[in-house]
């Protein structure tokens, strides 16, 4: 285990290395607030967040800075810099947070472009790419500094269903290959059922249920059942149409 949230003395949810951990729930349930808290944008009013057996609020400022260097973020939009090429976008965090040579940075960026299947577009600019290709570049940039944790905020927002599945599988593959603890905020049922290794359901700011994609459709948690039945895909699986 690399990370967990504690509510008073109980472990509310644990996030596992090499797994796609998902935070799901209706709009207003607290997914985005919790994700931002886990990233370290602000601290919790109560409860605890533990990284590698260390409680976040008890870390020194220097320790927090070092921890933040282990974190990669994939934003809801592409969040790419229009004035930088694809290669330049991936090199951006390396420019500011490493002492690597220009050759080393380019080598690492090209390696990552190959991993996300965008190796033939390194000299293009973001506005020359499709939404799916921009998202691939965003993934490459998010893991440019070899993070231990990857936070994804609605990574499939704005993508068509077919592209969403491709991005889901890419995130899952990267997570497992690099041994990253990935934490994803999503309401996309396809994503949940495709790659949800560990799922936490939030309801009114509380994690009510934790399980995986294999157990979620047989849940007896009433608020979770109501959430699932509000989704056409899940509803048709739970209650097949005649």
What are these regions (language model features)?
Residues 144-148:
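A short, proline-enriched helix->beta-strand linker immediately N-terminal to the Walker B motif
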Residues 150-153:
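Catalytic Walker B motif of ABC-type/P-loop ATPase nucleotide-binding domains
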Residues 1-5:
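Short, small-residue-biased leader/transition segments that mark boundaries at the very start
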Residues 47-55:
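Conserved ABC transporter NBD signature motif
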Residues 125-129, 133:
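Conserved ABC ATPase signature
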Residues 39:
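Helix-to-loop junction immediately C-terminal to a conserved catalytic motif
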Residues 55, 102-120:
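Conserved ABC ATPase "signature" region
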């Amino acid at each position: 285990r690399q990370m967990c949230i504690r509510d008073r003395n109980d472990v509310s949810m644990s996030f596992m290395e090499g797994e796609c951990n998902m935070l799901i729930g209706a709009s207003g349930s607290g997914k985005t607030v919790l994700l931002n808290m886990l990233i370290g944008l602000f601290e919790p009013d109560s409860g605890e967040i533990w990284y590698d057996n260390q409680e976040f609020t008890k870390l020194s400022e220097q320790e927090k800075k070092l921890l933040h260097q282990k974190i990669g973020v994939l934003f809801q939009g592409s969040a790419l810099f229009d004035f930088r090429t694809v290669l330049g976008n991936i090199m951006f965090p390396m420019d500011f947070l490493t002492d690597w040579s220009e050759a080393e940075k380019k080598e690492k960026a090209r390696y990552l472009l190959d991993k996300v299947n965008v190796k033939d577009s390194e000299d293009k600019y973001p506005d020359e790419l499709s939404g799916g290709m921009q998202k691939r570049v965003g993934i490459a940039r998010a893991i440019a500094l070899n993070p231990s944790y990857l936070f994804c905020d609605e990574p499939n927002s704005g993508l068509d269903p077919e592209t969403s599945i491709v991005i889901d599988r890419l995130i899952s593959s990267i997570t497992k290959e690099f041994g990253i603890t990935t934490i994803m905020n999503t309401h996309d049922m396809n994503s949940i059922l495709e790659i949800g290794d560990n799922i936490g359901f939030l309801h009114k700011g509380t994690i009510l249920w934790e399980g995986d994609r294999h157990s979620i459709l047989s849940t007896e948690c009433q608020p979770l059942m109501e959430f699932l039945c509000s989704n056409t895909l899940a509803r048709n699986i739970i209650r097949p149409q005649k």
